[in-house]
Amino acid sequence: MKLNTLQLENYRNYEQVTLDCHPEVNILIGENAQGKTNLLESIYTLALAKSHRTSNDKELIRFKSDYAKIEGELSYRHGTMPLTMFITKKGKQVKVNHLEQSRLTQYIGHLNVVLFAPEDLNIVKGSPQIRRRFIDMELGQISAVYLNDLAQYQRILKQKNNYLKQLQIGQKTDTTMLEVLNQQFVEYALKVTLRREHFIKELETLAQPIHAGITNDQETLTLDYVPSLKLSNYEANQSELIEEVLALLNDNLQREKERGVCLYGPHRDDLSFNVNGMDAQTYGSQGQQRTTALSIKLAEIELMNIEVGEYPILLLDDVLSELDDSRQTHLLSTIQHKVQTFVTTTSVEGIDHEIMNNAKLYRISQGEILK
């Protein structure tokens, strides 16, 4: 897939701008705080109906404006399609081909993106919450079923936590409702857990040769899914898995009542990256962590193409010039002539000349694209 045009109205520091996009590489050059990252963010937001930089949509609306609008025309193998996102201080509206979508699960997946920014090192060295969000953002783009199952799980988790809190403080004493919630909870917890486990295996298979290539076969990368629900046999039938998880919850019912919170489930999952058998979060150098993050991002690109049949759009926010020649070479081999890429940078120095030869440059200054 390709983004042909991007139009912004009252988005961040942009009053009104239209970007005619190059099908291969688009390089956004400018000093800091001029709006380069805002442009990349708008593409990400158009794809996932949420920003990666803020959870408050109101922050996306230009100062003293009542609304923000993002519109993009996409090209697929089978044709073109417009996507629109309209944001007000009361909420947001999304459209596919000019038709409003009542649920975000119907919208997400029409535009797939992979973002690589300096903070993506936190996927390796940050908290479990960051890694869970990474899994959900990437998996949600390629599976509407997963996105729906995750939403159902989060809804039931919230209900269960509310009831556990009432039991803890004595507002409720009957655990019958909790047993009903656990039945629903287990159904979706298993769906999320099993899909995540499969996703991590697929990602590992694709990331390992990429990582080996970047390190000249000096390092081996493995990914370990660390689920909160440690199932004895992931291949068991559904009824056996449900019985196993229900037994776990029943055995820990008193602990959950005392704590007033759900102690088991995908909301407590983690993911471990290991380089030569050592946990990269604890023992990896910054170079190893950067290589691991890059390998994962490049593997995401390939996985999305396998699952969706279209390459995603790659967003590189101020990271290209930080990659050494070896890493840039492997990045180039992945994206060249296949993946439309948007790059932000303060200078083109240090960017591979082959990337520059297939690029269109845009100079960004104070929320405007200079011709």
UniProtKB/Swiss-Prot annotation:
Keywords: ATP-binding, Cytoplasm, DNA damage, DNA repair, DNA replication, DNA-binding, Nucleotide-binding, SOS response. ATP binds at residues 30-37. PROSITE patterns: RECF_1 (PS00617), RECF_2 (PS00618). The keyword ATP-binding applies. One of its GO terms (biological process) is double-strand break repair. SUPFAM superfamilies: P-loop containing nucleoside triphosphate hydrolases. It comes from the Bacteria. NCBIfam families: recf. The RecF protein is involved in DNA metabolism; it is required for DNA replication and normal SOS inducibility. RecF binds preferentially to single-stranded, linear DNA. It also seems to bind ATP. This is DNA replication and repair protein RecF. It comes from Staphylococcus epidermidis (strain ATCC 12228 / FDA PCI 1200). The lineage of its organism: Bacteria, Bacillati, Bacillota, Bacilli, Bacillales.
